[in-house]
Amino acid sequence: MLTITSYFGFLLAALTITSVLFIGLNKIRLI
């Protein structure tokens, strides 16, 4: 149970970081 929770937490963190980087790159390109 703990392994599944930590895995989903890591997946969520990775997805958040990726989306933030993607949005940042798009904003830089727009400017």
Swiss-Prot record:
Write one Gene Ontology MF term: electron transporter, transferring electrons within cytochrome b6/f complex of photosystem II activity
Q: Name one GO cellular component term.
A: chloroplast thylakoid membrane
**Could you tell me the superkingdom of the organism this chain comes from?**
Eukaryota
Q: Which UniProt keywords apply?
A: Chloroplast, Electron transport, Membrane, Photosynthesis, Plastid, Thylakoid, Transmembrane, Transmembrane helix, Transport
Q: How does it sit in the membrane?
A: Single-pass membrane protein
State whether keyword Plastid applies. Answer: yes
- Cysteines joined through disulfide linkages: none
User: Where does the chain cross the membrane?
Assistant: 4-24
GO BP terms in the entry: photosynthesis
- Answer whether the UniProt record assigns the keyword Transferase to this protein: no
Q: Where in the cell is it found?
A: Plastid, Chloroplast thylakoid membrane
Stored PANTHER family: CYTOCHROME B6-F COMPLEX SUBUNIT 6
Q: Which family, according to the similarity comment? A: Belongs to the PetL family.
Q: According to its UniProt entry, what is the function of this protein?
A: Component of the cytochrome b6-f complex, which mediates electron transfer between photosystem II (PSII) and photosystem I (PSI), cyclic electron flow around PSI, and state transitions. PetL is important for photoautotrophic growth as well as for electron transfer efficiency and stability of the cytochrome b6-f complex.
Q: How does it assemble?
A: The 4 large subunits of the cytochrome b6-f complex are cytochrome b6, subunit IV (17 kDa polypeptide, PetD), cytochrome f and the Rieske protein, while the 4 small subunits are PetG, PetL, PetM and PetN. The complex functions as a dimer.
Question: What's the name of the protein?
Answer: Cytochrome b6-f complex subunit 6
- Please spell out the taxonomic lineage of the organism that makes this protein: Eukaryota, Viridiplantae, Streptophyta, Embryophyta, Tracheophyta
